[in-house]
């Protein structure tokens, strides 16, 4: 499994996890150009992103969520307007993305759905 922190800080956050041909982008708070540049430096491209998870609705985490098809996006309630309810993440309710088991946790943070 590969785990790459692409950006961290108040100007943008993004992490990329890749394992057995499946890529998950956690947060997309950086510009698309910057995202593609950073992925490219690691030997990946946009097509390697199979799923996008948003941790919460702050701009430094979701700035460029609109570049992704909502069918691959998963987030807490209220983070993406109009997202299918089957893609809403609920704290402590695990779900599968390919061979990954995701267990969302609830934390204290000033956000709609942290």
Question: What residue ranges belong to the model's regions?
Answer:
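Active-site environment of divalent metal-dependent phosphoester hydrolases
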Residues: 11, 57-62, 80-82, 110-112
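Short loop/helix-cap segments at secondary-structure boundaries that form the rim of catalytic
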Residues: 65-68, 80-86, 96-97
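Catalytic core of the metallo-beta-lactamase
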Residues: 94-114
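Short, flexible loop segments at the rims of nucleotide/cofactor-binding pockets, characterized by
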Residues: 2-5, 29-31, 50-54, 104-107
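Active-site metal-binding motif and surrounding structural segment of the metallo-beta-lactamase
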Residues: 33-78
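Conserved beta-strand hairpin/beta-sheet module of binuclear metal-dependent hydrolase folds
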Residues: 1-40, 114
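Short acidic-hydrophobic, aromatic-tinged amphipathic segments that line or gate anion-handling sites
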Residues: 87-91
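Divalent metal-coordination and catalytic microenvironments
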Residues: 17, 27, 56, 102, ...
């Amino acid at each position: 499994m590969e785990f790459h922190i692409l950006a961290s800080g108040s100007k943008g956050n993004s992490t990329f996890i890749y394992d057995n041909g499946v890529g998950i982008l956690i947060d997309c708070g950086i510009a698309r150009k910057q995202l593609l540049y950073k992925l490219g430096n690691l030997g990946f491209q946009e097509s390697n992103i199979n799923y996008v998870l948003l941790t919460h609705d702050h701009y430094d985490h979701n700035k460029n969520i609109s570049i992704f098809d909502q069918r691959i996006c998963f987030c807490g309630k209220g983070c993406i307007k109009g997202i299918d309810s089957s893609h809403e993440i609920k704290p402590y309710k695990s779900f599968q993305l390919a061979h990954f088991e995701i267990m969302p946790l609830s934390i204290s943070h000033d956000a709609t759905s942290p």
